[in-house]
Amino acid sequence: MIALMAAFLLSTNATPRELVESCRSMVPKTVEIDGRIILRNRRGIPQAEYAYVLKRLDGKTDLILKDADGKPVDFERQGRILKTDVTWSDLTLDYLWWDDFSFDAEREAESVHGQVCAVVVMRKGDRTVRVWIDRKTGAMMQAEEFSGDRPIRRLWGTRIRKFGERWMANVLEVETVGSGHRTKITVEELK
């Protein structure tokens, strides 16, 4: 019902707020996600791999990372996680809750994977993220983080899957621009 309402709202001239609210509504308030984070070189050869469990309960999020032997790994929430391209923001999509956002007028109606998207620029302090949102479904299709006026990281979904009643990206790619490698995030289980 919510997705149907979102599709109806977004088929008209939705405001940036309506688009962002639609994205927010697709992120469960309480969820546990199990998956893998795989750092790969330019040729796609794995360089490092970690299992993760992301738990979100009433807006509070916790992340557990494990190495190949299943042992917990310590990491910093600031910056890249364990030399991968992935950041805390990639896993939690925290920028969707920033309050300063507007349309990117220069990128009106761009397509991502054949879907016409609105492009919304989100800001918090000195951080800026550009988000492509599908005009029909209100789903986030990709995001770019900026340093000044140049993109430094990109995130995009490559596959979607239905978990119970919820459709979501189950394979995402994250790239630090110019690094020569990418990191794949997989979602194996959603509880």
Language-model-detected regions and their locations in the chain:
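Amphipathic hydrophobic-ligand
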Residues: 45-51, 151-154
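An acidic-aromatic
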Residues: 48-95
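N-terminal leader/targeting segments and the immediate start of mature chains
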Residues: 2-45, 57
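A short, amphipathic edge element
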Residues: 17, 95-107, 151-154
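Short, exposed beta-strand/loop patches in secreted or surface proteins that constitute
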Residues: 51-56, 103-111, 131, 158-160
